[in-house]
Structure formats: C-alpha cells, structure tokens
Amino acid sequence: MILGFKGFKPGLVATLGNGKFQYVPNELNETKKAMCASTGFHYCLDPWDCLNWYTWNGKNEFWAVAAGGDVNEDGYGSRSSCTKLVPLRKLTAEEFLLMHANYVFEHPAEKFEDSYKGPFHVAYGRDKKLAGELGEWLCFIIQDQQESICIAQPIDGVKILPGKNYTAESLEAAHNEKG
C-alpha cells in the first residue's frame, strides 16, 4: 500500500465516476478493476491535485489514504486509480499544505506554478509575494540547494492580516511576533 490523498463530499462520499460510493474510515474497500477516469478508486499522490475535482469549501473532506492492489496511472497530474483503498485520516488545512510541500520536495525535477485554489495561495521559491482574505491561507514552498522549507499560515486578522503582501520571510516573522 502507498500513501495517497482523496477528496470526498461530506461524510466520505465519492460522487464522481460510477455513481455514489460510501467509504468508511480505516476500512478496506475493494473493487475488481482500476482504470483512470473510468473505474476503480481514484486518488492522487499530491493532495493539491485533489482540488481539480473537489473544492476546499468547508464541506468537502480531504483524506490521507492507503492505496494498493492493481494501480493505474494516466499521467494527468498525480492522479491514479487502484483496486484497494483505505481512508486513513481526514486532513486539516495545514496538514494538506504540508503534505503538498512534501510532494514538491520529493519531486524536485517537477515544475510547479504559483497558484490560488480555494482558500490556498501557494508560491514556489524565494522573492515571491502573497496576499489573501481573512480565513484564507498563505503558503511558501522553497526548495533550493541550501534547504527545503514550507511556511504556511492562516490569515487570522491578528498576526497575519488580510490584503497585506507577505514574503516568506515577513510571513514567518509576523507569525513569530509576540503579542
């Protein structure tokens, strides 16, 4: 089994594909065939790719899953399909961003574009600026020869302010400010 990520409608319900499927946490789900965009249990190796099918809207759920059995990949991002899947744990927003950063660090040859999906503003590399609204997240993922770091913070209106531009350094400094 390998670690993957999957988006769900509320209550661990998958509605994309062949109708509606109800998953149960920590239980093995099995099917006969896996073919991306057709059949099987779909998941992504990069949690960020899950946002292509399910929005982070406060209702949908994003889980870490164990995937195995027969696995099919089609080269569309990190999407895969498998015949065995276990929903392991629902992810918080911070965990979701950290798991995405981990995927980025494990795939240094892959190119990632700065993006904004749902409440997440993500920039890759140094000397970038991000801003957002109250309740959204700012995330800098930096990987170079010296270090691999992820700085992710919610815009809380207290330490991290809405509408203000932050660099990775200023975001970290604002978060670490006493007060």
Give the location of each predicted region.
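Short, glycine-biased loop/turn motifs at secondary-structure junctions and
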Residues: M1-G179
